[in-house]
Amino acid sequence: MKALCLLLLPVLGLLVSSKTLCSMEEAINERIQEVAGSLIFRAISSIGLECQSVTSRGDLATCPRGFAVTGCTCGSACGSWDVRAETTCHCQCAGMDWTGARCCRVQP
């Protein structure tokens, strides 16, 4: 019985120690994540966003060339609107007095 216990001790030691060691694949994956995260952060941090608001009388408000709609607002307490062709806000209620669009574009 003592001999069996002595034989099992090295096996148990290997099982325990193998869990604490980092495998080569894990180390490589961690390094790839670090480098990729750094590159992505640098790329994103250099991008700017330019936004402006446009307001028009009636039920349509169109963004300037190169800008896209990011949000719409309507007068007369109307909450129903849609975006047309990615550049124009359309308020769907009858008799709209004004329509607003928030327009943005990416700046490198």
Swiss-Prot record:
Localization in the cell: Secreted
Tissue: Expressed in white adipose tissue (at protein level). Widely expressed, with particularly strong expression in lung, bone marrow, breast and peripheral blood. Expressed strongly in bone marrow and at lower levels in lung, but not detected in other tissues. Isoform 2 is detected in adipose tissue, bone marrow, brain, lung, peripheral blood, placenta and thymus.
Biological processes, Gene Ontology terms: fat cell differentiation; negative regulation of feeding behavior; positive regulation of progesterone secretion; positive regulation of synaptic transmission; response to insulin; response to mechanical stimulus
GO CC terms in record: azurophil granule lumen; extracellular exosome; extracellular region; extracellular space; specific granule lumen
Intrachain S-S bonds: 51-104, 63-103, 72-89, 74-91, 78-93
Keywords: Diabetes mellitus, Disulfide bond, Hormone, Obesity, Secreted, Signal
Superkingdom in the source lineage: Eukaryota
Pfam short name (any one): Resistin
InterPro entries xref list: RELM, Resistin-like_sf
Principal place of residence: secreted
A molecular function GO annotation: hormone activity
Signal peptide span: 1-18
General function of this protein: Hormone that seems to suppress insulin ability to stimulate glucose uptake into adipose cells. Potentially links obesity to diabetes. Promotes chemotaxis in myeloid cells.
Stated family: Belongs to the resistin/FIZZ family.
Assembly mode: Homodimer; disulfide-linked. Interacts with DEFA1.
Name used for this protein in its record: Resistin
Organism annotation: Homo sapiens
